[in-house]
């Protein structure tokens, strides 16, 4: 029996995405119908990097499905600090849990984990690679505000190291969205991501400033500069704060522009934006609960041999 994992957004077809988002809408409309749906099951939260929203929302989502959760706690207090390999760690944890959520600083870590275990694995961020469950809640937020067809989306900030960007850009190609990428030259999309987007037929439009494209956008997706990914701290300080928006920036934006951010933010969105009708990032964060409930529900259904979203690894 084939187990399903969610490792990259590129694995998701439009039908896969809509299956999760439709289920998420059902969960949001009638959460009681999903309570105790997976009572007795256990979700392992394996976070080798700091996390607030992703970890807590998966924890909450699992418990709202009736699951128990287990976690590693501080990595320094685990056997990883003794030199245990990721492969050994996940193979041991597989015996304790029915599904595994993994965040790791190394790109490809979730792929390795999925190759080693037979329970569903969800990639909760692998270095500067991907973050597909974040993409699902991003798309849910966009759909609830605009729908997913005929979109023009601007993605601004750290496009080189921002894993949420890489996942979202890939998923938006399933909906033929017009995408504009706004960043300093040093933080433009990685060549491999640009190549993959071109392979889908997507138009990759790159800009170094927001002003020229703001009026065209339905969605502006802002990301922080990923300080922890920079090999040279001097380079980080050179570009930090270069791409910021405030309420004044948005005065000429379309009235229905949705401003999103995967959070945490530093200074790239000023607090005065919170008071505008454009701000959607807290709604976006809250959408992590129904979306991750839906995702876990479907993956566990697949693991049990029922019909659900097909996610090939």
Swiss-Prot record:
Name this protein carries in UniProt: Aspartate carbamoyltransferase catalytic subunit
Pathway(s) per entry: Pyrimidine metabolism; UMP biosynthesis via de novo pathway; (S)-dihydroorotate from bicarbonate: step 2/3
Family, per entry: Belongs to the aspartate/ornithine carbamoyltransferase superfamily. ATCase family.
Function of the molecule: Catalyzes the condensation of carbamoyl phosphate and aspartate to form carbamoyl aspartate and inorganic phosphate, the committed step in the de novo pyrimidine nucleotide biosynthesis pathway.
GO molecular function: amino acid binding; aspartate carbamoyltransferase activity
Key words of the record: Pyrimidine biosynthesis, Transferase
Residues the record lists as binding carbamoyl phosphate: 53-54, 103, 131, 134, 263-264
Catalysed reaction, written as an equation: carbamoyl phosphate + L-aspartate = N-carbamoyl-L-aspartate + phosphate + H(+)
Gene Ontology biological process: 'de novo' pyrimidine nucleobase biosynthetic process; 'de novo' UMP biosynthetic process; amino acid metabolic process
Subunit structure, interactors included: Heterooligomer of catalytic and regulatory chains.
EC number: 2.1.3.2
Pfam families (UniProt xref): OTCace (PF00185), OTCace_N (PF02729)
Entry binding sites for L-aspartate: 82, 163, 224
Keyword Ion transport applies: no
Top EC category: transferase
């Amino acid at each position: 029996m084939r187990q399903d994992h969610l490792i990259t957004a590129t694995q998701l077809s439009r039908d896969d995405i809509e299956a999760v988002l439709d289920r998420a809408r059902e969960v949001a409309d009638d959460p009681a119908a999903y309570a105790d749906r997976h009572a007795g099951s256990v979700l392992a939260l394996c976070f080798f990097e700091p996390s607030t929203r992703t970890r807590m929302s998966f924890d909450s989502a699992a418990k709202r499905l009736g699951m128990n959760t287990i976690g590693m706690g501080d990595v320094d207090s685990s056997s990883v600090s003794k030199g245990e390999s990721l492969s050994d760690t996940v193979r041991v944890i597989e015996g304790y849990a029915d599904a595994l959520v993994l965040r790791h600083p190394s790109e490809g870590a979730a792929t390795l984990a999925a190759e080693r275990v037979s329970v569903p694995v969800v990639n909760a961020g692998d270095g500067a690679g991907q973050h597909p469950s974040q993409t699902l809640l991003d798309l849910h937020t966009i759909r609830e505000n605009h729908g997913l067809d005929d979109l023009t989306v601007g993605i601004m900030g750290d496009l080189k190291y921002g894993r949420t960007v890489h996942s979202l850009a890939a998923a938006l190609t399933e909906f033929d969205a017009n995408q504009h990428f706004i960043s300093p030259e040093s933080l433009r999309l990685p060549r491999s991501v640009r190549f993959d987007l071109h392979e889908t037929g997507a138009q990759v439009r790159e800009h170094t400033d927001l002003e020229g494209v703001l009026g065209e956008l339905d969605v502006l997706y802002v990301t922080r500069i990923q300080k922890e990914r920079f090999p040279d701290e001097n380079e980080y300080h050179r570009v930090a704060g270069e791409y910021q928006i405030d309420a004044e920036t948005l005065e000429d934006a379309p009235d229905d522009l949705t401003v999103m951010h995967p959070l945490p933010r530093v200074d790239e969105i000023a607090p005065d934006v919170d008071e505008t009708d454009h701000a959607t990032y807290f709604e976006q964060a809250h959408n992590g609960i129904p979306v991750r409930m839906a995702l876990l529900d479907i993956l566990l259904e697949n693991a049990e041999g029922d019909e659900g979203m097909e996610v090939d690894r």
